[in-house]
Amino acid sequence: MRNEIQNETAQTDQTQGSMFSFFNLFPFLLPMFEVIKMVVASVASVVYLGFAGVTLSGSAVALAVSTPLFIIFSPILLPAIAATTVLAAGLGGKKVAAAPEASPAASPSLSLLGIPESIKPSNIIPESIKPSNIIPEGIKPSNIKDKIKDTIGKVKNKIKAKKEEKSKGKSEDSSKGKGKSKGEDTTTDDDTTTDEDKHGSGAKHGKGESKHGKGESTHGKGGKHGSEGKHGSGGSSMGGGKHGSGGKHETGGKHGSGGKHESGGSPMGGGKHGSEGKHGSGGASMGGGKHGSGGKHESGGSAMGGGKHGSGGKHGSEGKHGGEGSSMGKNSLSKKKKEFHYRGQAMDASSTSESSDGSSDGSSSDGSSHGSGGKHI
């Protein structure tokens, strides 16, 4: 037992000796180690105290600064905190139907502020000043719209009535014009072969370029044919030249002896015109018309067909009137003398008219046809 105890003590001594063997080798380091411990402890304590002091001082400064600020703003902060807690707690419940005035917490904002219920907006504004009572019923938007619609309808009815009156007036005027034309249209020249029957003197049959007849040629003997009468065809026509003496004969111009004759429509139909009959140019004047003191006058609408012209005979413009064809008239023999009428560029070779006085001025007898060879353009 003693041996074991001695061995153990020896081992402990060895371990302890090994621990301090460094100092045994360097024994002068032992006092320095003590100094080092003191220095390290002091430095550590200073650092620790420094951090602690900074922390404490920071907190102290924070307290010193925040406390007066809190005191200054407390009148605002405290009500704000109270309102926030009230709203967050949800104390503003609805009034109970059984006991509406039992708890003041039913309207928390008013109860907290102490505002009595008698000065609520619904109680302040009287019913007499409410918008529903201020605006009378007659000025409501629905009534205004109805009035506007009524006025617009009245204006439209007035405009329609005026238009109808104007249309009636125009129809009456047109009917009067037609009556006049019908009453004055019958150009009955009984003396179709009298001494002063001028036909085609200075007359232009075309668009002002080719003249139909000489300036002073008298056609037949008898009453004036086409003197101062007006024949106006309202429509468009290609042959717009003048034909006739005294009275102008146009497809869109004037022709007739006596009263006015105006056809309301376009001259699309062949009307008849003679010194002894009626002159109506109401239809499409597409076919050849006849014109003579004893015959009929049918004017071509665009003067596209051959019109015949002559007293007793026929004066037929075989080409287009308004086109390029030359008008060559065929006449009937009346007396003994034959002559050729040269007009413009074309020769009226077929018009073998017998002149009563033998002159070449176109003063032909009753039955002679006046066929001029000028081109009708």
UniProtKB/Swiss-Prot annotation:
Subcellular location: Lipid droplet; Membrane
Membrane topology category: Multi-pass membrane protein
Region spans: 3 X 6 AA tandem repeats of E-[SD]-[KT]-H-G-[KS]-G: 196-222
Record's compositionally biased regions (Gly residues): 232-244, 280-292, 302-314
Region (3 X 5 AA tandem repeats of S-S-D-G-S): 355-368
2. repeat placement: 196-202
Pfam families assigned to the protein according to its UniProt record, in alphabetical order: Oleosin
GO biological process: post-embryonic development; reproductive structure development
Protein's UniProt keywords contain Membrane: yes
Segments for region (Disordered): 158-377
Taxonomy, superkingdom: Eukaryota
Start-end of each Sequence repeat: 115-124, 125-134, 135-144, 196-202, 204-208, 209-215, 216-222, 230-247, 260-277, 278-295, 296-313, 355-359, 360-363, 364-368
4 X 18 AA tandem repeats of K-H-E-S-G-G-[SA]-[PSA]-M-G-G-G-K-H-G-S-[GE]-G as annotated region, ranges: 230-313
Region (Hydrophobic): 38-133
Tissue expression from the record: The full-length protein is found in the tapetal lipid bodies of immature anthers, the proteolytically cleaved C-terminal product is found on the coats of pollen grains. No expression is detected in other flower organs, siliques or seedlings.
GO (cellular component) term, any one: monolayer-surrounded lipid storage body
Function: Many of the major pollen coat proteins are derived from endoproteolytic cleavage of oleosin-like proteins.
Name of protein: Oleosin-B4
Native species: Brassica napus
Upper lineage: Eukaryota, Viridiplantae, Streptophyta, Embryophyta, Tracheophyta
